[in-house]
Amino acid sequence: MPSNQNRDNFIDKAFTVIAESIVKIMPIEEKEKKAYIYYRDGLAAQNNGDYSEALEYYKESLLLEENKIDRGETLKNMAIIFMSNGEEDLSIETYEKALVENPKQPSCLKNIGLIYEKRGRNAEQNGDLDQRDIWFDKAAEVWTKAVKLYPGGYLDIENWLKNSGRSSIDMYL
């Protein structure tokens, strides 16, 4: 095993031990602790590529979690899995639920835009320029929101918006 991987595994294990210790001593409700444990286990399964297991843990976490920011993060991770599995409509739907819980998640908007932009490129390859423009306009709409939430964080998207003529001057104000 390469030394970088050993170091990363050590860091992951150390973080897990520290996080578990903090969760045990924190003055929070048992329900919240369980929600966090399900979330943590979902994240571990997702990082290991076991997406079905991760989704099950995330669903359990959502049943217990009341904090909107944490719910938004859990939903975002579920949407990432759906996106990875090619379930684009379900991914968009789940990103939108994440944004309802926590509207300040620019990465959700960025990823929705990636799906729209991909659909636009596919339409272009099929010679359907009207459909391409519809999808590109939708991508521009959500990407503009993402850039406003995270200025300078998505330079490639900012460049796409400028180069495609879909950038508005007020986006940077």
From Swiss-Prot:
Main localization of the protein?
Answer: membrane
Pfam families under this entry? TPR_8 (PF13181)
The free-text function statement in the UniProt record for this protein reads: Essential for the assembly of the photosystem I (PSI) complex. May act as a chaperone-like factor to guide the assembly of the PSI subunits.
Topology in membrane: Peripheral membrane protein
Which InterPro entries does the UniProt record give? PSI_Ycf3_assembly, TPR-like_helical_dom_sf, TPR_rpt, Ycf3/AcsC/BcsC/TPR_MFPF
Highest taxon of the lineage: Bacteria
Annotated Gene Ontology cellular components are: plasma membrane-derived thylakoid membrane
Gene3D superfamilies linked to this entry: Tetratricopeptide repeat domain
GO-annotated biological processes: photosynthesis
Which residues does UniProt call coiled coil?
none
Kindly list the places in or outside the cell where this protein is found, as annotated in its UniProt entry.
Cellular thylakoid membrane
- The answer to keyword Kinase applying to this record is no
Q: What is this protein called?
A: Photosystem I assembly protein Ycf3
Q: What keywords would UniProt list here?
A: Membrane, Photosynthesis, Repeat, Thylakoid, TPR repeat
Q: Family, per the entry?
A: Belongs to the Ycf3 family.
Each TPR repeat, start to end: 35-68, 72-105, 120-153
